[in-house]
């Protein structure tokens, strides 16, 4: 592995970690609301959170580009802030966050739906408030599924390519990730480097999932423990 590829790998780990950390807690809250509450427009919200999964990554990238570009629909006009982040590491984080969020939300929602709501009702009758019930009962019971959501979100962020190259480019040492480094190596005919990077991606992803499996088998209370 040359220096540029090593830098791309380290940047990928950094950007994927930051993106996952940013969307994980909001994703859990959205997943819990979708799993536990009924409200007008719930189907619409659920479909909207899954939209990046079915859209072509380049389409998602174009939508983000329109929000972030100086001649597009400015983020300043929508959010009241100037989002001048194109072709920067921040754009990579945005791309990774947008594409990993749907997996986090869907997996966490399944985990919350797997927790029997009667346990939460019992906790409320014992005097626990909604927040305390969520923290002391719901989260531990759903922990295995939530850990799976975290790992899936992280690995999806690591593998992000289409949205990243659209809004962040493929700048070595700045916005080039592992996926774009593989693409660059293929484009110049450096098959050995490309194949090696593919193996690195496989090994990294496998180790991440294996770690999640090992952690999920330790110290996680099951439903039967209540």
What function would you assign to each model-found segment?
Residues 216-226:
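Short cytosolic juxtamembrane segments of multi-pass membrane proteins
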Residues 126-127, 140:
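Glycine/proline-centered hinge or cleavage motifs at structural transition points of membrane proteins
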Residues 2-113, 137, 141-162, 185, ...:
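Membrane-water interface segments at the C-terminal ends of transmembrane alpha-helices
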Residues 40, 128-129:
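Short coil/turn motifs that cap or connect alpha-helices
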Residues 123:
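The alpha-helix within a helix-turn-helix
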Residues 119:
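Helix-turn-helix DNA-binding elements, focusing on the entry/boundary residues of the two helices
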Residues 65-66, 163-189:
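Glycine-rich helix-loop "coupling/hinge" segments at transmembrane-helix boundaries
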